[in-house]
């Protein structure tokens, strides 16, 4: 076997596993929505597709992917099922854990590079300082993917040692109780349940500062961490919007409604709406990936991303999330009475597309903060970088 072919074989195998995973997901997505979480057996399937080694440091056996490659994969998953795309997006969260002490990371990856992490970061709750670290007692929300996670994280406020940036404590699943409270209109299958921790002492070396300095020197961990966390969520919305557009095109030639009106595709306003939605989604998506590539090139050149580049990543992400949600809403508006039924595909897609836009990383405050940075002013929201 030639060296070139040998090098290509893992990528080919990974792509085959990825396609197999997508085919299984198309069959099981209703199951996940009904049970309100992605089960552990499918998390194992995501692992075989390489999702949970995409942000594991190479020094620990990982295959860290350029951000654009990982984002494209999450978008493709989300076009099949937004909830699974959302859970899979946290395969990128291991960039956070690169701020753990090096020896702690060596323990974390001792059994292999495929580690599924789920965090419940809000509301941040202070731990009681101990000689070894912190004693935690509290309840945290939105632990997406916690049912299938190998390790969990809970949020703590910033302190003097973290320069005010929030901390995360890393826990084994048996150290937390999962409370399955999750009754929502969008991303129902994410299993974004609550975590309850009672009197658990976490060693200091098993905590890290979110967005803190990484202890691993590889290119991915020099890419803006918080911006990347926003990007992986925004691109879920893009995948959902793509599914909605594909549905609109597919049914447009067949649905005529009960009044005898022309088929949707024969109505000028429907064609206009679909065309505008296509243009808007692809334009927002193009800028999103353009900004991603520019920052990655900067990182690969050995230079730090500038504040302006970070702001553009945050802005492009918020814009993509908003555009994706608007696209689905517009398609519902022009699709007649069919989408009012709870079983209509656009109903689920509308709820799924709404969730990224509502996330704190992608909400209205991001536009203000990005605008400030673009005009040479300090960011107006904490944790912008």
Which residue ranges define each predicted feature?
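Glycine-rich flavin
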Residues: 38-48, 52-149
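Glycine-rich beta->alpha junctions and the first turn(s) of the following alpha-helix
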Residues: 185-187, 192-282
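Basic/polar N-terminal segments that are highly enriched at the extreme N-terminus
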Residues: 1-23, 384-385
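Generic structural signal for well-ordered, non-transmembrane alpha-helical segments
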Residues: 239, 275-282, 314, 318-325, ...
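Short segments within alpha-helical structural elements
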Residues: 326-333, 364-368
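C-terminal helix-coil-helix/basic helical segment that borders enzyme active sites and/or dimer interfaces
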Residues: 26, 30-33, 283-319, 329-340
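Glycine-rich phosphate/cofactor-binding loops in nucleotide/flavin-utilizing enzymes
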Residues: 337-385
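DPxDG-like acidic metal-binding loop motif
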Residues: 139-176, 336
């Amino acid at each position: 076997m030639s060296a070139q072919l040998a090098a290509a074989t893992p990528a080919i195998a990974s792509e085959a596993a990825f396609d197999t995973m997508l085919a299984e997901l198309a069959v099981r997505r209703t199951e996940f929505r009904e049970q309100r979480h992605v089960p552990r057996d499918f998390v194992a399937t995501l692992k075989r597709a390489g999702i949970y080694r995409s942000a594991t440091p190479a020094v620990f056996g990982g295959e860290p992917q350029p951000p654009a490659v990982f984002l494209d994969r999450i978008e493709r998953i989300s076009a099949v099922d937004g909830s699974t795309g959302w859970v899979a997006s946290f395969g990128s969260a291991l960039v956070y854990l690169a701020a753990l002490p090096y020896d702690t990371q060596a323990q974390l990856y001792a059994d292999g590079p495929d580690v599924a992490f789920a965090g419940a970061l809000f509301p941040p709750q202070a731990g009681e300082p101990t000689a070894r670290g912190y004693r935690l007692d509290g309840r945290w929300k939105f632990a997406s993917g916690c049912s299938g996670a190998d390790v969990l994280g809970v949020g703590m406020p910033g302190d003097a040692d973290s320069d005010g940036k929030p901390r995360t404590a890393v826990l084994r699943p048996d150290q937390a109780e999962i409370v399955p409270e999750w009754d929502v209109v969008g991303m129902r299958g994410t299993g974004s349940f609550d975590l309850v921790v009672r009197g658990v002492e976490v060693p200091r070396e098993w905590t890290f500062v979110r967005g803190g300095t990484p202890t691993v020197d590889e290119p991915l961990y020099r890419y803006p961490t918080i911006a990347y966390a926003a990007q992986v969520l925004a691109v879920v919305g893009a995948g959902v919007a793509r599914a909605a557009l594909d549905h609109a095109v597919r049914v447009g030639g067949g649905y005529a409604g009960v009044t005898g009106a022309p088929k949707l595709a024969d109505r000028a306003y429907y064609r206009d709406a679909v065309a505008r939605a296509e243009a808007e989604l692809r334009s927002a998506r193009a800028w999103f990936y353009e900004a991603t590539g520019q920052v990655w090139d900067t990182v690969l050149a050995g230079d730090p991303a500038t504040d302006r580049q970070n702001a553009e990543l945050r802005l492009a992400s918020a814009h993509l999330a908003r555009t994706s949600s608007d696209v689905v809403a517009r398609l519902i508006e022009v699709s007649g009475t069919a989408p009012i039924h709870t079983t209509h595909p656009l109903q689920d897609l509308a709820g799924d597309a709404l969730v990224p836009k509502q996330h704190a990383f992608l909400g209205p405050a991001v536009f203000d903060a990005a605008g400030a940075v673009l005009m040479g002013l300090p960011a107006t929201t904490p944790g912008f970088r």
